[in-house]
Amino acid sequence: MLIRMISSISRWDGSRSVNRKDAFICGDAISDLRTTNNELRVWKADTQEDIEDAIVALALNRDSVSKLSYFLLEEDELKKIEIDVSDQKPGAAAGLKDCILSKHRDLIELDFWRLGFLTQYMLELVKNPKQCKNLTRKEIKALLEKYKNKNLITVEQMNSKLKEDLKW
């Protein structure tokens, strides 16, 4: 499995309406699939520990602790829609141990069609509460504290705004 952060599940679940009789998905959801160099960042997430590792990495790339939403993507399903996964670039999250950063992946060689197929796939996933989740600020903060206490985060290397928000 792979984990992909999104801005909000409400963009995907149909609760945000578009005043068109032919509306398919709210346009804001597409911004969750913004690529760089035709790639989309994801994290390896085969276990609950992997999921937590990814969430911590994503949280460490922010200026403050805030809610976080994500989808869990099945690699076999991505293969069916001809989306390839690369492990060539390590992840980046200031202060996080390399053993976690090595779980970073990229969906690569994305084009208009692959993004469309990925959108359709994610619209199916949103119907399954096991495949998508919203985490509260409190849950994110508790996870960051847990990783700090396990010495998996080097506080001195963290983003100063995030450290200030956490009062570390």
Predicted segments, located by residue:
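Conserved NAD+-utilizing ADP-ribose enzyme module
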Residues: 32-38, 46-168
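ADP-ribose/NAD+-binding catalytic cleft of ART/PARP-like enzymes
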Residues: 1-41, 55, 166-168
